[in-house]
Design a protein with these regions (language model features):
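Carbohydrate-active catalytic/glycan-binding domains of CAZyme proteins
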Residues: 1-116
């Protein structure tokens, strides 16, 4: 759960992690107890999703505030393309008019450490 710009966002990971549909989605409400919008509307994960050939099953995420005290990040794990290991990933969270999105995510290549 995350409050942003006066609204409450409930984030969750969903679908079968072995499929390209698995990822992080959200529903939103004006009050913490709801009612909440229909999540995804059947369109699949909107915040973060698999990238065939690079990363599968991104999810099980947390939110963190960056060292600048302003930038939101998603911290999550994902399978590598060969499905031999799960990797820890970190991507900026962008607040767009269409809702939150993993900015430049999911990670599947080295990225600079936040604040450096």
């Amino acid at each position: 759960m995350r409050r942003h710009a006066g609204k409450y966002y409930c984030f969750y990971s969903g679908a079968n992690f072995l499929t390209d549909r698995y990822g992080v989605d959200f529903c939103v409400a004006d009050q913490v107890l709801g009612p909440y919008s229909e999540a995804g509307g059947g369109s699949g994960a909107r915040v973060l999703h698999s990238v065939p050939g690079h990363v599968r099953g991104p999810g099980h995420h947390s939110h963190a505030l960056g060292p600048d005290g302003r930038t939101d990040y998603l911290v999550y794990h994902a399978w590598n393309a060969a499905m031999t290991e799960r990797q820890l990933c970190l991507d900026p969270l962008a607040w767009t008019p269409a809702g939150p999105r993993a900015d430049r995510g999911p990670s599947y290549s080295p990225r600079p450490v936040p604040g450096q």
